[in-house]
Amino acid sequence: FRPHLYPLIGPHGDSVTRRLAKPEDDLDHPHHRSVWVSHGEVNSFNNWGEGEGSGRTVHKEFQAVESGPAYGRILAIGAWVGSEGWKSPVRSNELLEERAEWTFYNTPNNGRIIDLHLTLTCQEMDVLFGDTKEGGLCSVRVEESMQVSSGQGGRITNASGGRNEDETWGKRAAWCDYSGPVNGNDVGVALMDHPASFRHPTFWHVRNYGLMTANPFGLSHFYNNTNRRGWLVLSPGQTLVGMYRIFVHDQGPDEADVANKYNDFAYPPQVSLAE
């Protein structure tokens, strides 16, 4: 139904994201596929779930695939479309063009850094991003042993010091971290929201069962107030931008210095040349 990034390998060689669901698996929320981009209400189409009637993101091409000593880069172009068989009232069946630029940095083994620069461009008809908690511009589903609900030591932490779902769900924060054990090693993954992203600092749809997603749309749910509206309408040619960093680290967020790693992302050193 949509592209995803899997596996997300941590510092000890194991994936920090859950295995991909197969039809015969009894996994909850099988549409939570490692690291992905989607939203639950796009012109009435559900491009978050899977199944009959769901919207889709169709991969079109890789405009760039690069590798080098400092970083590798992939620029993937996709199209957000309606459910299978849907016919648009305009020329194309595309609601949005997705440009997902992924940069994979060559970093020390105790920490891995991946940047996502996401641009969604409205095509030939107005597009409504609905106010729903089911979705987000960048989502992560962690390995099962890392889940808070597993009782094995998993924990959620946000930039404001909130802990676990009760203190982080629906809250705004510049970053959110999910840490816990994988094959005997304490590891974590932090998702960071850049100041240039839409509605920074983002709201978080983060759950004790392993989901962590940056969702800037679901305001009525997060505030529990139907007068707070988070929907957005794009007209043809308008764009929505999200910039995120995924920091996969050893140990917990304090030991990995996630707060300062966020500052490196949001406020990098500036270089100027004197004449």
Question: For each predicted feature, which ranges?
Answer:
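A short, structured loop/turn motif at beta-sheet edges
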Residues: 62-72, 106-110, 181-186, 197-198, ...
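Short coil/turn motifs at secondary-structure junctions
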Residues: 83, 123, 249-251
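Beta-strand-rich N-terminal accessory domains
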Residues: 1-29, 117, 126-128, 195, ...
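Active-site/ligand-binding surface loops and adjacent short beta/alpha elements
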Residues: 126-128, 132-203
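Beta-strand-rich recognition/accessory modules
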Residues: 192-275
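Short, well-ordered beta-strand segments enriched in hydrophobic/aromatic residues
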Residues: 114-122
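Extended, loop-rich substrate-binding clefts of extracytoplasmic carbohydrate-active enzymes
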Residues: 28-110
